[in-house]
Amino acid sequence: FSCSSEDECQFMHAMVADSPLGPFMNPTCFYKRFSIDSHVVETEKGLFLWYSEDNKDCVRIGTRVFVDKLIDPMTPANQPREMIVPTMDEEIFKRGRNGDKDWHTIEGAFWFFEGEWQYVMYSGGCFDNDSYHIGYVAAHSQKSDLTRVQFVKHTNNGKFAPVMYKNDFEEGSGHHSVIKYKGQYYAIYHARDLDCQKRNEFDEARTARVCKLHVNDGVITAERYSDHI
């Protein structure tokens, strides 16, 4: 989890417990810097942590996705590799946020594999408006060391081609998890009804939703409906 204090802004931590019901105790700080959206997976090479942090030493500055090896569940190797970076204006979080530069956001990574392909889905843009979307990168690879896999962002000939984006009934679609049930993939995500009205800037209008995902040979598509799965 990530949390803030007077001197810390969204530093990533982990806690331990003898039961999933808790109590969780003894927090350990993984990174003494902004670090969010942890997603731990296990392969034959061990545990890997997908997460997001900032990079200002680049052309498209902002938040992007990294992966780091975990020595054990409470100890990162602290050798993160940048895996998914902003490449287009549709991934802008806020224009002019950092002086004369636009701030981009790629966050909420979720890794899984199907057949001979590995996928990392992510959320991009700004969660608070209709730019928020879900995209993915894919790799035709059997490598178990996820820091060495070369993922390629899915686009339409280099242009914006998200799996999920605003449609005629919802916006702000993102920050999802993926499950496979009886051979069918599903995305559990949040979004807002397109016609919702916020009472004020602090009103949270997003709700949890489910849709089918179709995953085949490096391509992911979503099947969304307003009234059923």
Model-inferred region functions:
Residues 1-229:
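Carbohydrate-active catalytic/glycan-binding domains of CAZyme proteins
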